[in-house]
Amino acid sequence: MKNIKFGHSLLGTGVSIVLFALISDYIGFGKPGFQAAQLLLLQFGVLLSVTSIGFLASGSELKVSRLINQITTRIFNSPTANWVYFGFLITYILLFIIPVFFNSDRRIDYLTRYIPEITPVGRDLSFATSGIKSWLSGNGFYLKDLNYPPLYAVVFSPFLLLTYPTTFFVMTAITLFSMVVSGLILPSLILKNKDSAVLFFFFLTGIFSYGMQFELERGQYNVFAFTLSFLAIYIFHRHYQFRHLAYLLISVAIQIKLYPIFFTLMLVKNWRDWKSNILRFTGLGIFNVSLLFVLGYKTFIDFINTMLILFGSVWTRPYNHSLASFVRDLTSTGLGVFKPDTVSVLQENSSLIKFILILYYLVCLAIIVGRAYRNNESGINFDLFAVCTIGAMIIPSLSIDYKLPLLSPVMALALSYSPKNDHKIRQIIKMIVLIVISLAYSYTLFSFVHRPVFLANCFPLFMIILTGITCLNVVDKRSFSQVESQEHLTAQ
């Protein structure tokens, strides 16, 4: 079809709509008088008529099939950022616009009281420093039900030189600085300013998120521990001559929070060098076990007893996103979704459900590691980093929502890497997966108070992200050796 023919058709349609809008009142169509519907038709007709001018001015041939192909190609080849933003837009409408502006009260309902606050702020920091003070006084470190490794008392002992609220101010500054390092500086160094839009977007979402506010309110140090781990990973892969510093940093992180042990899997330079990898992990294991004796044998025994109590108990709260907490909630309340009979069946099989969920995580982890081994990859594997972070979130029995900011940097890295793929089916799958991952992540930015009941606990969202990352790794045939090789070329 020639553009000029299509233009005439469009012009005829537009003029017809305008004429109908003008004479509809005279022919008795609709309500008497010039109504809003007629004005709408009038505007639409004028729009079509004006648009037709462009087609009339062009005499080239218009092929619908070619046009559709161009549109679909443009959509499928859209930058990753577009699909990430689209997922965020959906969440923004569902969890902000609708509850704030479209509520039944017909008034602005500000999102307030969405953190289970404790007065005064910085309670966890004050509680932990009081334990350090107790240890220095000779009364023991674990008298106050603390569950941190012994080295924590050494690392954070300088806080005793300060008084509250100065301690809280200093910890807040450390956390914010750590967030800048882990969420902006290190990813920028790794990506060399590529996909900076996605990177900066995730940094902003992380620093303004509900989880970050929770972290600051409690005076927690998850972001600090994660930053030490991330810095260790970066040094190990990009400045290998300083690898011993990397071992020290990640060991300190483990001795502060324990769960950074998941990130030791990132300290692999050559997946097929079994001897070096075994020696490295063995050395790290021996070193970290020895650090548990830093305050003496008795403190070590107290720590072990504390861990046994912690691992044997499940603290069920909507903001405890651990696997154990989720299964307990699922099998006791049904998350407000399942009927009592179904809940009873779930409760009888709670151990099996736990096993299946842990097995599913391990399978996803094995797929990522297996592909890295098969491809003999080197460098920082962004997908593995994301999966390790999710493991650090869900495996510990006590895992509170103030750990959520840890997702921001790893998601930025995982979703910023997008190898070119011309296979249409894979492009469609990738597009859908990116939107789903973005949607799941963006839900974690809002408090459990404003999420749907069945998503109040973040665990299902983590499993969606885990599945999506694994799917991208396989479908997109992602290989991160290319990123590392590009880094070396840039350095030269």
Language-model segments: residues:
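Hydrophobic core segments of transmembrane alpha-helices in multi-pass, intramembrane catalytic enzymes
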Residues: 43-46, 221-230, 258-261, 403-412, ...
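Aromatic-enriched
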Residues: 103, 107, 413-492
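Juxtamembrane "helix-exit" motif on the non-cytosolic side of transmembrane helices
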Residues: 23-31, 373, 441-451
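Transmembrane helices and adjacent periplasmic/lumenal helix-loop junctions
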Residues: 250-267, 396-406
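Juxtamembrane interface helix immediately N-terminal to a transmembrane segment
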Residues: 1-17
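Transmembrane alpha-helices and membrane-interface helical segments
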Residues: 181, 185, 227-238, 266-271, ...
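Non-cytosolic membrane-interface motifs at loop->transmembrane helix junctions
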Residues: 31-41, 225, 451-459
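Primarily membrane-embedded glycan-assembly and transfer machineries that use lipid-linked glycans
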Residues: 67-239, 243-245, 270-401, 480-481, ...
